[in-house]
Amino acid sequence: MTITDSVLSKANAKEIKSVVVMTERLKKLKREWEDADPVVYVDDTLLFTKSWKETDGLPVDLRWAKAFAKRLEECPILLRDDELIVGSLTKFTRGNNVLVAMKPREVLEMAKTGRFDRKLSDISATYIDPEDLKLLIEDAEYWVQHMPTVNYVNEALKEELGEGHFDLMFDRGMVFEGRAVRVDPDRGLFQGWGAFGGGIAQPTMPVIHNGLNHVINLAKAEIDKMVDQGACLPGASAAALRKYYLLKATIVSCEAIIAYAHRYADLARDLALKERNPVRKQELEKIAEVCDWVPGNRPRNYWEAVQSLRFLHLACWKESSERPEVGIGRIDQILYPFYEEDLAQGRLTRQEAGELLGAFWLKIRETENLVTIKREHRAAPGTLLPDVTLCGIDENGRDLTNELSWLVLEVMRQIKLSEPAVYIRWHEGMDEDFMLHALECNRDFGGGNPAFLNDKLGTDRYLARGVKPEDATNWLASGCLGYHLECGEHMAGMFSINQAKIFELTLYNGFDPRTKKQLGLQTGDVTQFTSLEQFYEAFFQQEDYFAEILRKHYFIWWSSENMNSPMSGLRAAMLYEDCIPAGLTSREGGARYPVCRASWIGDRGITDVADDLAAIEHLVFRSNKFTMAELLDAMAANWQGHDDIRQMCLNAPKYGNDDDFVDEIFNRVSLTTQMILTGRPDPFTGEKPMLFKGAAAGHVTQGASVGALPNGRKAGTPLNDAGTSAMPGMDVEGPTALINSATKAPHAWETVGITHNMKFPKAMLTSTAKLENLAALVKIFFARGGWHIQFNIHDSDELLKAKENPEQYKNVLVRVGGYSAYFVDLPPELQDEIIARTLHEVY
């Protein structure tokens, strides 16, 4: 059975597959963006600072809202030739936005040293106008001088945990990872994961379907209710005043977004008056009509719905542009009612729908922030993680796949950009031909889009935490393989433990060979150990010790931030309606489910630890190939002069080959560490946390701090990627064996963000039969309880050529962890790690 002859032909699958997304218009717009040099854009940050100076003394929510409004009212706006969907983050074709108040010292260091790089490579170097550079330096110097006590968090940590605690942090010992666990973070007005309301926000379906005027009316009605009840009279409680100003800030922000859209309407009208081409003139008049109406009101058609989604997504970025993970949401569900009605009324063709969606896709990708953080500290270089979620089932078990689900994939395949990322909520009732279409698009895209999530597993996690079925089924992908409810939930700050580092400390009795300091417990001289059980005991003791330290760090950090650093949380209040009557941001408990998923703690490196223990058991205790002392000597020399020992370590049993010996070690290590880390309740909510295993590129940054390991890995090289992927090149028994290893530990999938990467050659997936075999592999993976799976599909020599000749391969896409990226933008060590991943075959 072919895709176009399937049961979905009645859903016009064949016509959708024939849609030409890359029209001459979109080819031109994409080419202009690709050819443009990234330019630093300073207007927004200067307007923010100007407003902040003007509003000194006002409540922080209102100050933040007014600064947001000033940017929308006065920032330059850009409407490029041939655009149909409008709204640009900057005035440049390819601009890098920055909000200096968020990271003034990082910006100042970059500006004064002239170190401008958008991502990680010379190919994507960023330009800044000399006059703008002067203004940027002035802005950064102002904020450095006017920040609250810069090290207030560190002072609190020092007082509670001692000076030695800093040796564990990310920019020293690298036992812990995260922006909030650095000795010298750039602490601006707002900091850390979980800032801006403590929730990941994106334009939600109710806001788009009802319009921002509806949100304004809700906020005004709540204020009227407070006035009627006398809650705003002199002597009102602090909580009442807090609610009042949050509501006022919400109104100011929503009105500013509507006014911003009207600026585009006026610009389009002005351009239409000057336009001589009658076709373009009509398009500009249509753009003006659309922008006059949305996002203030409910869209009247598909074009308006797409434009409303663009304005609201852009507004989220404008409001707090340094916060990543502004998702796009369940786009096939959001837009489908308007698409369906327009098709039925003859107002829209599928071709027109595809071009409008493609125009939207380009606008999402053009959004870029200036990357200032040092290269070695970047977990996800350059990516902004604007995720799209498709399909799934509702509370009644109905398959929600629709025509737009197909069309989104076609847009993604043809336009071929690193972002947005697309995630499909797979379920047992999914149409087989849609699955083949998804894999076909995956093959043609090459860089891991779409990825697949287990729909039932995601829903069951929420049901188990008391979420109503209608909400539990309405979840979406967010960030780096996280997920959250569309109706809103609280997400705390994020901290990760480097498991490979903890195991290294175990090998040296708590001593760190890198910093030459005693960082951990003295759990015993491993050269005297006589069984693997002693290694388990020592490692788990270290784990328990560091888990408690990190929990204390989290409590001190979050408490100190709340007391000292203003966090408006405006975006979450604006987009989650439950926050309005509560008068609280999602961070403060205003979301519908404020404590349903506390996932403040994460880890990386479990598969490395499993391989290490397997090598020790196999080579030291069972076969007596060498002693533990000899192994430590070889690792201390980073294997130089010990090639024989290293080769034996590399050849030892490895996770990912359906080998019960090493898989049982992985299961025990992952289960026990998970119990240790989640056995401590969130100190604020009392909830049992869900362990976060988001991939990004943390295996590179954390690997930099870890010496040689018993699995044969060299010092400073990347750890194993993702949560259940094997050591690169060591999963040699085929894809089924890897999947069997990954799904033997069901507890591993009861986490957030755990990733499973696989790589296949494009040449092997050219036939429908091979795609059907790959689809069967995905089904087996999910049937065995897997959560997430994604594929890099490249021929073996393509990436090698791209590394050698980057200018010729600028648009080659790869899947890193929970995101896709341009291969040439990645650091060499990450490029090498992706190249080294096993190239599996589909039979």
Q: Residue locations for each model-derived region?
A:
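Conserved catalytic cores of very large enzyme subunits
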Residues: 2-247, 279, 283-286, 290-293, ...
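Heptad-repeat amphipathic alpha-helical coiled-coil interaction surface used
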Residues: 251, 258, 265, 269-272, ...
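Structural signal for well-ordered, non-membrane alpha-helices
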Residues: 262-265, 269, 365, 674
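Extended non-globular scaffold/tether segments
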Residues: 244, 248-260
